[in-house]
Amino acid sequence: MDLGVAAILGVVQGISEWLPISSKTQIMLVSIWLLNASPEYAYSLGLFLEAASVLAALIYFRGVYLKALRGFVGDAEGRRWLVYILVTTLVTAVVGLPLYYVARKWLVVGHSAGFLMIVLGLAVVLNAVFLQRARFSAGLKAFDNMSLRDMAIVGIAQAVSVLPGLSRSGATVTALLLLGYKPEEAFRASFVLVPVAGLGATALAYLSEGGAVATAEALLAMAIGIVISIITIKALLEFAKSKHVVLVNVVIGLLAIAGGLLRIIF
């Protein structure tokens, strides 16, 4: 891998991780096209580069993680974040670990995952239509009132996204929007989960490839991915904070559909 390819991989990772398009799939495509890598190695490289997203999230949402730590000593808001992270992580681990090994062995599931992303995207667009007709955006849920059931659903959505072609942020943001949460709450609650899921993915990729993915060029791609990720997070959260709830749903839905189509075509 030369420095140019490393830079491209970093930019792709930094943008695609936070959009409803699978960063793993985009990294796989770039790696196969530009590096002539095997699908198995390209898949592991995509998971390894999620470390860039992990570090970017830790930097951007450091205040949230500090609150979660204070939840251990009785801070009410911190406890809500702590419970959310623990519940979703537990569910993700239970459901996601078996799926990872299945996905790595049978990468043909990518096309099926692409169809699933299209279905999810259509569901979010349909949700936007309902929002527009009902005009109940003021009654959307806030994170403070999230139930254990909703947390578990988010964990399942995150676990399923280990399959090639499925976007982690796309799956979790979609789940939260369909559960009725405000767009800004959905984006933030989804992005906050990146470190836990990403660390697990990076560790699995490193171990399964015997450390072969941790090259100097891959580390450069990771560094570039961190910078691009922070810029992308800020832009998306600002967009989600806008009052155009219906527009946010439509855009997310259309991006999910586009991501699914890309996976099916390529």
UniProtKB/Swiss-Prot annotation:
Protein topology in the membrane: Multi-pass membrane protein
Gene Ontology molecular function, alphabetical: undecaprenyl-diphosphatase activity
Enzyme class per UniProt: hydrolase
GO cellular component, one term: plasma membrane
Recorded superkingdom: Archaea
Short name of any one Pfam family annotated for the protein: BacA
Keyword entries, A-Z: Cell membrane, Hydrolase, Membrane, Transmembrane, Transmembrane helix
EC number(s) from the headed UniProt entry: 3.6.1.27
InterPro entries xref list: UppP
Catalytic activity: di-trans,octa-cis-undecaprenyl diphosphate + H2O = di-trans,octa-cis-undecaprenyl phosphate + phosphate + H(+)
Cellular localization per UniProt: Cell membrane
GO biological process: peptidoglycan metabolic process
Residue ranges crossing the lipid bilayer per the database entry: 41-61, 82-102, 106-126, 159-179, 191-211, 213-233, 246-266
PANTHER family: UNDECAPRENYL-DIPHOSPHATASE
Protein function: Catalyzes the dephosphorylation of undecaprenyl diphosphate (UPP).
Family, as annotated: Belongs to the UppP family.
Protein name, UniProt field: Undecaprenyl-diphosphatase
